[in-house]
Amino acid sequence: MNTVEENNTKITDNNNNNNNNNNNNNNNNNNNKNNDGENLSQQLIDSNNKKLRSPIQVYFDSDVSSCSLQSQSSPQQLPTQQPIQQQINNIFNHFLPQNQAPLLQAQNQQPINNINQVSNFQIQPIPLTFQLPNNINTNTNNTNMINNVQQFQNNFLNNNDFSLTDPVPSPFVLFNNNNNNNNNNNNNNNNNINNFHHNNINNNFDNNNSNYNTINTHPNNTNNNSSNINQIQSNIYPQQNLHNPFLPIHNNNNINNNNINKNNNNYNNNNNNKNNNNNNNNNNNNNNPQLFSMEPPNGFNHSTTDNTSSVSSVPSNKKKSSKTKQKSKPLTIQQQQQHKSNYHQQPNQNSQHLQSKPNSPILISSPLNSQQNSSPPQPSPTQSFLSPPQYSQSPQNNNFNNNNNNISNNNNNNNNNNNNNNNNNNNNNNNNNNNNNNNNNNNNNNNNNNNNNINNSTNNNNNNSNTNNNTNTNTNNNNNKNNNNNNNNEIENNNNEELILLWYNSIIKNIIVDENHFKIENQFNKENGYLVFKQLFKNHFGSIGTIGKEMAEYIQLHCEVMNEITELSKFHFQSIDNFYNNYIRIINGYSLIPAKDSGATIKARPKKGAKLSKESKDILENWIKNHIAHPYPTNDEKEQLQRQTGLTPNQISNWFINTRRRKVPTLCDEAGIITNSNVMPQMTINNNNNNGGNSNFKNNNNNTITTTSTSNNNNNNNNNNHNEMECDDGENEESSEYDD
């Protein structure tokens, strides 16, 4: 059975003025002080400790404007590094067509001789027009937040750890057109989330600007204005409320705290007559969690002609027990509203004449309760119309609710709230100058009278009797609130850390779009890079737990759009690779000449048979007859023969290798050139074998050859054959392909 002392403690719980209100979110930043690796991250970001860093060097090994490929060779062959901004502009200039697929159809079947002809096959560019979701407000209210996120990302990319000349642009810059009208309202330019120097910071939401503004208050001022959460959600997201896994979940504790704040403010303003129902509802919710208060619709006139209240619950089987002869009924909510001036009931008063107001709050059963009643319950046949209504609990257990209403409306003295130590089964006597019932007031029996002696000084002893219990309950409630706030802060910090990791990975993926076209100098340690990013985040935004819900949602949307741009850029590079590797090679009648370096142009030649034409053979034979003394063409001579014959350098080299082996000795005999054991004439060749033999050939003006040999003829023949193999320029795989 609930006693009056418990009721008084609940009332004094609500009467404490802002001293027991949501006792401080003091642990917003304390949870982040002991994070592992913070000292390491501070060292990594320190400019004096550059040796600990793992620098990222981004190379762009292909010129997107010319669409030339880069071989995966040494970094010395890489072209001059372009700014990232220029590279991205080049990427966007060669982006996707309207149908989201590359148009790789050739305009003609002519030979591809340079990159200008390859550009005829390029895909058509389209502008980047990303549209923000409908639930995101892109007015001037979010301009400061957009600039703040962009500034932090630019600072991170311009750090010494990255060798980037220009940062990766934010996709939201495209949507800031005509959004710079109200930047000076309430000095929001200086109130961005930039300065977080105290452990205790108020996250006050400005409804006029719909933006979080940090207020650098004193560390002792820890009142958290959390009463506008629902209003914030309705203002920012009028269409739908997104469920974000990276955002903190606001549980029912905030809603309960808001109710407590409202009650405290009403007590301070002495609006006791307007808050009777609120106090009643709070007490009823504490006793019966299945009941909650709601306002009936307009025009709903709820009468009590059947002498039953609108409290819907299961009728109790317990019977009313009374030890006194004078029978009294507990006052209903509607009766108390009509009798605001006098809060006690006459013994023979008939409740049949009472009617509730149309807009009076009623207590209905919870939707979770299967026994919900949409209409007031009808009295049982055995129940008298003059009998009090039946509650889910016995009348003795619920009579204290009426006392709470009486106590909350006595503004004369706060200490009188602790004097109601009896049930409403007895008479309520308001004796202003009664000194005879002091002994009865000192007892806590349920059968004594309630004597509200407002001007009686002897009642102060009784008033002080329950103060210790009240303070104990208040401290316990404060401890519970602190524990709930700490748990909420830990959840928010964990979600925000996941959001920071998502942002970091999005930036890295946006920089290194495709590993085939972008290279990293040395080996980048992503763990150390994340510590640097996290420390920069703390320096710029403050504690991880204080970024706010709207900022967290914006960062997540920022990462989503950045990832979309990364995927589109990756598709662009894949389209280029597929274009070169598949499309050009299947052109009928032409074959692609692969590029050996980044500066070489892409060429294609007509496909020909294995045997050379007669005209090409005559040109090559005439050249070797004229140079029979030294049949080794230089690179310039090979290019000249290439232009005359229309052959490739590989074909010319293979022809000279085969001719020197098979026809040069015969041509030398026909020309009257004397050779030693069919040794091929050369200008000067020094051969060293294992025996230490030296063979020196010198070409004189009279085409005579002077030979000095220290080895036998077999060694000379072996050395000469070895020399022939070294002169084929590494292209002897087709040596027998062009035999006559």
From Swiss-Prot:
Q: What keywords are assigned to this protein?
A: Coiled coil, Developmental protein, DNA-binding, Homeobox, Nucleus, Transcription, Transcription regulation
Compositional bias (Polar residues) spans?
A: 1-13, 339-363
Task: Enumerate composition-biased segments (Low complexity).
Answer: 14-34, 179-241, 251-288, 303-316, 365-390, 397-491, 686-722
User: Could you tell me where the Acidic residues compositional bias lies?
Assistant: 726-740
Q: Which residues bind DNA?
A: 605-667
Q: Name one GO molecular function term.
A: DNA-binding transcription factor activity, RNA polymerase II-specific
Location in the cell reads: Nucleus
In terms of one coarse class, where is the protein primarily found?
A: nucleus
What functional role does this protein have?
A: Putative transcription factor.
> What is the protein name stated in its UniProt record?
Homeobox protein 4
